[in-house]
Regions:
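GNAT-family acyltransferases
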Residues: 1-99
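Polytopic alpha-helical membrane proteins, predominantly small-molecule transporters/carriers
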Residues: 68-72, 105-108, 137
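Short beta-strand element of the conserved SAM-dependent methyltransferase core
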Residues: 71, 168-169
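Short coil/turn motifs at secondary-structure junctions
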Residues: 88-90, 107, 140
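Conserved acetyl-CoA-binding loop-helix of GNAT-fold acetyltransferases
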Residues: 101-104, 110-123, 127, 146-150
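Conserved GNAT acetyl-CoA-binding A-motif
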Residues: 125-136
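Conserved beta-strand-loop-alpha-helix junction that forms the acyl-donor binding cleft
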Residues: 135-145
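Conserved catalytic-core motifs of GNAT/GCN5-like acyltransferases
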Residues: 136, 152-168
Length: 169
C-alpha cells in the first residue's frame, strides 16, 4: 500500500484537482469530502471558498468552519481522495454528514487509501481539540462502514433521512 499524506489544496494541484473532479462527477453529481468542489467551475474560486470555510468569521451562513485536505500519494503527489473535517456539528450535521466527509477516486478504491486518510484526519481532529467525532455513511455502503470501524469507531445508530437509512458512528 502506497503512503498517503493530507495536504491543503492549492493552485499547484489545480490540474490534478480538475482530473479528480471529472472522474468523480462521472459517478455521482456530489463529491463527498470536497467542500462543494462540484459547484465550482474554477479551482481558484473553490480555493477561495475553502478559505472562507476555514474560519468562524468568514464561513458562509448555514455552514460550520471546516478544513479540507487532498489525500495525496507521497511518492508522486497523485490525488487519491479528498477529506473534509467539520470543526463542530450544527443541527444538520448531527443528523446527516457528521464531522468528516471523504471520497476516494473510483479507480483507487479498495487499496486502503480511505483508511489512511481517515486515520490522518482523526489526528487533525485531535489537533483541533475535538473530543468526539461523528462519521456517517449510507446503510448500504459496506466499504465506508468498514473504513469507519477500522478507526475504532463505535456504532451509534441508524437514522432514516428522506427515506434512506444512515449509519452513525
Amino acid at each position: 500500500m502506497e503512503k498517503i499524506i493530507l495536504v491543503k489544496p492549492d493552485l499547484s494541484y489545480a490540474d490534478e484537482i480538475i482530473k479528480y473532479k471529472e472522474e468523480s462527477l462521472k459517478e455521482n453529481p456530489l463529491i463527498n469530502g470536497a467542500a462543494g468542489l462540484n459547484n465550482f467551475s474554477s479551482i481558484e474560486d473553490w480555493l477561495e471558498e475553502l478559505k472562507k470555510r476555514s474560519s468562524q468569521e468568514t464561513v458562509p451562513e448555514g455552514l460550520v468552519p471546516s478544513s479540507t485536505f487532498l489525500g495525496v500519494r507521497e511518492k508522486d503527489n497523485y490525488i487519491v481522495g479528498m477529506i473534509d473535517i467539520r470543526h463542530y456539528l450544527n443541527e444538520f450535521l448531527k443528523q446527516f454528514g457528521g464531522n468528516i466527509g471523504y471520497s476516494v477516486r473510483k479507480s483507487k478504491r479498495n487499496k486502503g487509501y480511505a483508511k489512511q486518510m481517515l486515520k490522518l484526519a482523526l489526528e487533525k481532529c485531535k489537533d483541533l481539540k475535538m473530543k468526539k467525532v461523528l462519521i456517517t455513511c449510507d446503510e448500504d455502503n459496506i466499504a465506508s462502514e468498514k473504513v469507519i470501524l477500522s478507526a475504532n469507531a463505535k456504532f451509534e445508530d441508524i437514522r432514516c433521512i428522506d427515506g434512506e437509512n444512515i449509519k452513525e458512528k
